[in-house]
């Protein structure tokens, strides 16, 4: 009886102890869950890279003094790194554009209404999500294509840039279709599809989860994009160096 009375008198302390134990257990559980989720996310990011991450570096810029000349400056730096030091150096940018031929394609617009639902571009189904890059990026990631497959071709005095399309559009966009970018006026020729390929987050490759490219487009920088300081400025902190290709 004394034991029972003691328990009843101290039930407040027991309750507090139970609550604290529950909180401690919950925090431990959430910590383990978050660590596992982070591990899984980092593994997904590692799987996107085909290069050795111990020898892969990101070129970072804390300050850009002259934005207007950035495109010219950064391209000169990348060329010097490649030519003088024989180091793979590539950058990419995820951008939104629109193709003249697709902006009036009912099937494409209907498909994109579902793809872009609940996003910033929900009211703009003609928008196309594009990954544009230096071909040297193919030394860092494996998307099932090679550098020569991204080489532009000339026909009738016009330059056509190879374009690879996410498999989600396979029934809408066909190989050898020609698409015209409404912003730069670039002409693209569809060369193939991206099957089960992932890519980095547009803001930060190492902080945010990867996403699939089922409804994205992949191509190389056009001449106009290479010289466009806005486009090149957006590649800041997405410029990669592969040191195992350097001269010893």
For the regions a protein language model found, what residue spans apply to each?
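A short beta-strand structural signal in non-transmembrane regions
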Residues: 227-247
């Amino acid at each position: 009886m004394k034991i029972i009375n003691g328990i009843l008198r101290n039930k407040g302390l027991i309750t507090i102890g139970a609550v604290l134990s529950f909180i401690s257990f919950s925090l431990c559980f959430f910590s383990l869950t978050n660590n596992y989720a982070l591990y899984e996310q980092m593994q997904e990011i590692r799987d996107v890279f085909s290069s050795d991450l111990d020898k892969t570096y990101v070129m970072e810029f804390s300050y850009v003094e002259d934005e207007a000349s950035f495109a010219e400056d950064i391209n000169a730096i990348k060329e010097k790194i490649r030519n003088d030091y024989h180091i793979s150096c590539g950058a990419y940018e995820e951008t939104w554009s629109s193709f003249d031929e697709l902006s009036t394609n009912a099937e494409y617009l209907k498909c994109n209404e579902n793809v872009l639902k609940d996003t910033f571009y929900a009211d703009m189904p003609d928008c196309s999500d594009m990954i544009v890059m230096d071909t040297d990026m193919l030394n860092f990631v494996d998307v099932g294509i090679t550098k020569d497959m991204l080489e532009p071709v000339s026909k009738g005095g016009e330059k056509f840039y190879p374009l690879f399309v996410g498999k989600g559009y396979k029934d809408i966009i066909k190989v050898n279709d020609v698409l015209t970018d409404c912003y730069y006026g670039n002409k693209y020729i569809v060369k193939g599809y991206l099957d089960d390929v992932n890519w980095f987050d547009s803001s930060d490759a190492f902080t945010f989860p990867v996403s699939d490219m089922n409804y994205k487009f992949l191509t190389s920088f056009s001449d106009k994009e290479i010289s466009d300081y806005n486009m090149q400025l957006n590649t800041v902190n997405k410029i990669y160096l592969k040191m195992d290709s350097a001269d010893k």
